[in-house]
Amino acid sequence: MPPEPARRPLKKAVESAEKMLARLTEQMDGVLARLADPAIYSRPGTVVTELQKEKARLEREVANAEKRWLSAQEALEAAA
């Protein structure tokens, strides 16, 4: 097993990816809650369209963050 200082950057990468996933998930929950509100669909304008675009953006970011987390986790496990 490599010494702890050698693993520290790998642990930080995993923790950073986990924090990013948590932040993105929280944002996604907010967007989904707004899209679940029936009242939003009776309003004129582009609110729904903008929320759908935001949802799609967040879905892409979550997928990328999950890949970064998995890669970091695998590197940490390989260093064990």
Segments (PLM) and residue ranges:
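Charged, heptad-repeat coiled-coil alpha-helices that serve as long linker/dimerization "arms"
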Residues: 1-80
